Curated annotation (Swiss-Prot):
GO CC annotation terms, alphabetical: cytosol
Protein name: Leucine--tRNA ligase
Cell compartment(s), UniProt: Cytoplasm
Keywords carried by this UniProt record: Aminoacyl-tRNA synthetase, ATP-binding, Cytoplasm, Ligase, Nucleotide-binding, Protein biosynthesis
Reaction it catalyzes: tRNA(Leu) + L-leucine + ATP = L-leucyl-tRNA(Leu) + AMP + diphosphate
GO MF: aminoacyl-tRNA deacylase activity; ATP binding; leucine-tRNA ligase activity
EC number: 6.1.1.4
InterPro entries assigned to the protein according to its UniProt record, in alphabetical order: aa-tRNA-synth_I_CS (IPR001412), aa-tRNA-synth_Ia (IPR002300), Leu-tRNA-ligase (IPR002302), Leu_tRNA-synth_edit (IPR025709), M/V/L/I-tRNA-synth_anticd-bd (IPR013155), Methionyl/Leucyl_tRNA_Synth (IPR015413), Rossmann-like_a/b/a_fold (IPR014729), tRNAsynth_Ia_anticodon-bd (IPR009080)
TM stretches of this protein: none
Species in which this protein is naturally found: Bradyrhizobium sp. (strain ORS 278)
Family: Belongs to the class-I aminoacyl-tRNA synthetase family.
Main location as per UniProt: cytoplasm
Residue interval(s) of motif 'HIGH' region: 43-53
Lineage: Bacteria, Pseudomonadati, Pseudomonadota, Alphaproteobacteria, Hyphomicrobiales
Motif ('KMSKS' region): 630-634
Amino acid sequence: MTSERYNAREAEPRWQRQWDEKAIFATKNDDPRPKYYVLEMFPYPSGRIHIGHVRNYTLGDVLARFMRAKGFNVLHPMGWDAFGLPAENAAIERKVAPKAWTYDNIAAMKKQLRSIGLSLDWAREFATCDPSYYKHQQKMFLDFMQAGLVEREQRKVNWDPVDMTVLANEQVIDGRGWRSGAVVEQREMNQWVFKITKYSQELLDALDGLDRWPDKVRLMQRNWIGRSEGLLIRFALDPKTVPAGESELKIFTTRPDTLFGAKFMAISADHPLAQAAAAKNPELAAFIAEIKRIGTAQEAIDTAEKQGFDTGIRAVHPFDPSWTLPVYVANFVLMEYGTGAIFGCPAHDQRDLDFVNKYGLGNTPVVCPEGQDPASFVITDTAYDGDGRMINSRFLDGMTIAQAKDEVAKRLESEQRGGSPIGERQVNFRLRDWGISRQRYWGCPIPVIHCATCDVVPVPAGDLPVVLPDDVTFDKPGNALDHHPTWKHVTCPKCGGKATRETDTMDTFVDSSWYFARFTDPWNETAPTTPAVANRMMPVDQYIGGVEHAILHLLYSRFFTRAMKATGHVAMDEPFAGMFTQGMVVHETYQKADGTYVNPADVKIEVGGNGRRAVLTATGEDITIGPIEKMSKSKKNTVDPDDIIESYGADVARWFMLSDSPPDRDVIWSDERVQGAARFVQRLWRLVNESVAASAEAPSSRPANFSADALALRKAAHGALDKVTGGIERLHFNVCLAHIREFANALADVLAKPAKPAPDLAWATREAAGILVQLFSPMMPHLAEECWQVLGHSGLISEASWPQIERDLLVEDSMTLVVQVNGKKRGEVTVASNAQNPEIESAVLALDAVKVALDGKPVRKVIIVPKRIVNVVG
């Protein structure tokens, strides 16, 4: 038995060097074994990894190591999502070039990732800001353009006049730019868009086949795509009330059955009818300006008070020319959805009800719940959105909702105005085409040229990549490419005249929408992929990342893969066969009396009779223990992975990340549990060394027979092997760790016996120790390598095959059943695993505890739940 402690600080770098020197994690594309592609979402090179990265990449690494041991040709690459705004901010704030800042950060973070002991194929590494990467992205842009999947169109955008850039809706806060604070303007601008809507139905339908994706992620994508079946209705406008040239208002509704409950029409502030009305109404113009000041982010709209302005325009009900509806400009109607106009049926829509209650428009219920008297059914403060029968709806009365929808559609489809039907059944999608133009320097240049004679001209493929210039300055607001004295000035490749480059760059979501395909052959200099290789290695078998990317990144990647298929780069539709969303790492917060946050490293926790107390280590002053929250710099509740690895080793950090909770749930950081993981590492080290001593005289060949003790140990070993194997396959890593601990206890019990083990038990001990080390090797690979050598193996455990389960050892000779009398537990009974019901019944009725509980009463029946419970009813 060794008296030395396991020294992670010495061992971990040594094993990492061996892995690198032997290139054991390098994947060969021509390997004939079945492939397994595991990928974690690649990081943005911000400068340092955080503890959430450790969890994310550990999850993938466990799976990669396991599948490699199972005999798969594992592809487990790493790269950098390297374009983006933070690099430009750093250039402005720190006077450092975005390129230098980015590559310095990559070098620092790569060193950190290596220290975690990840089984990555670093030979495939790239950054999306490498010209050798975005060259192929530009080529695909041109391919997509030729295939009709890229267009240039006028779009209304949020323009920051100080930063001189387009802002996403989410970047407009109270009508001002999130960074500059300038009042945001609405502008019409030419934008490059990917035609993702061409795949709306396909993207929706294919979700049904993604059965290894979380249901919540698929639901989020369904809602984002937002398929709705309804009716497009052309409401006539009262000519006495409308601006010149306006005659009708088109709305799309999924509830045409509620037309007789309509009380108002509402249009977006951007609707042409609103603009026409505002031209002659200063008050309306001011109201529209206020709406635009608040912004059009969905969150802002949802939380803002519902407001409207009566334009004075009146719409005519399609079934009653004498019935007109007021047309409001409302702050909750967006031009991006449907037609930018709705009719409001307040009795059956809560938002509409709140609106009419504010403006005194009243409501008329038109759907009555089954079993309720229509004469007494009224709506006050809560809209009814359930099923029922139609009321107050003339020719629809008595119909179901479905019948009423169909009847309204039939009637309006058959009525004409101006040679076209008043109603038309339509399928609408919430999904909009993907605008990719960004007025930023640090992004992939869009490979087109603008010529006064030839208009938009693609950059010839032979001239790719269009490389970003390094000599840019950020002393002026706006896009540094616009200010560059020479970069944008070129010769038109079509006519030879003077022309200019496109100075917009691509949305960084484009960069991450195909990187997984590039990893299959990043050495191809002439094409984005090598189709034969990509088609063999794709799709990604297991993708791992945060749920915050459930919509945009995953949806864009699904579109991009289809577009790549349409242009001949891959043959599959879906990029990710399996998707796993891990939880966050969270931590307590600590605050001084004045409310300032304190770093956990500066706090000492004391546990006494009154519970936990926090004090500032330096001064001893009391610190308030706040709620457990997501780690953030602002609340100073972060933990530096380097500190943990330096203090305890990477394996301890990995083990803690896997053991505390299911991987799809948040894990609460706890110094105490980290220390517990460190103690367990030392315990495993001792167990392995003790096992070597105990099995020193074990026979080299397997004994013909095993004693009860040896057989029990072998059953524990193979039972743990079976459970951990299944647990890793299901990504139930925390359960796996519990089984490993349980098995370690069983081995420790054997080793604790003072007697020298018989040869069969010594052989079983050696086998058990080997299985134990292999079980924890995906989670704690450095410790496993060290233990593997102690066990006498010459090779690396990272190259060893996963042990075979001996199924006959999983068959239990006996089973223990809970015994109840009249539903109350009275004890347990152990019987043969193949015992029949009469034998079980006899054994149970013979128990003293059962006899006492029955107290002489006759047994009426015995209920046996197989392999679980026996309930005696007396």
